[in-house]
């Protein structure tokens, strides 16, 4: 009796329906989804504010990166370096400081949470006392260093408002807190858009102590105009 021909197409079809095949396919799909989420959460570089997702704000995902420029007493530009040292940043991979286009188009503007520094001279408006001191202090403290930013919100100028921390010889420092300690910033006065994380009480306590010690802006005494008052006078005509 001649052998009965085997229909390979039928065998392939029934093989696909095997539970093991389904389990393997489901496992591969789950692994791919999980890997993509890990990549987006920890390893994807955020090049600009356009790459920043609402999820990152909702969950306060920490960002690690390099301070490329300090342009004012309470904000700076930040080049995101996900994975930090473990992914080679600083020893295998370099921040492209010599590329002006990248420094402009692929950095995030960070606004320090909870504080307001004295206003510098803009558009013919006079500078506040200690405005240059605040700028110089922040440059010396952050420029050219790797920092961690915890984002809280995005303001009207498309800046990420968040807590910035930097490692110093005596531990990790909250930059907003250090500015308050040294009297080069005050606690943010605005009612709208104020962000403190869970540090508002601490910030107010540090400001109170700096005021008592007459540090920085508090050395001016009763003549001291806060940044909020300055903006009302010179920008809103009050």
Curated annotation (Swiss-Prot):
It is found in: Mitochondrion; Membrane. It is an enzyme of class 3 (hydrolase). It comes from the Eukaryota. The gene is LCL3. The chain crosses the membrane at residues 20-39. Its main location: mitochondrion. The active site is at 111, 119, 159. InterPro entries: SNase_OB-fold_sf, Staphylococal_nuclease_OB-fold. One of its GO terms (molecular function) is endonuclease activity. Keywords: Calcium, Endonuclease, Hydrolase, Membrane, Metal-binding, Mitochondrion, Nuclease, Transmembrane, Transmembrane helix. Belongs to the LCL3 family. Its EC number is 3.1.-.-. GO terms for cellular component: membrane; mitochondrion. PROSITE patterns: TNASE_3. Pfam families: SNase. Residues 61-220 form the TNase-like domain. Ca(2+) binds at residue 116. This is Probable endonuclease LCL3. Signal peptide: none annotated. It comes from Lodderomyces elongisporus (strain ATCC 11503 / CBS 2605 / JCM 1781 / NBRC 1676 / NRRL YB-4239) (Yeast). It is a single-pass membrane protein.
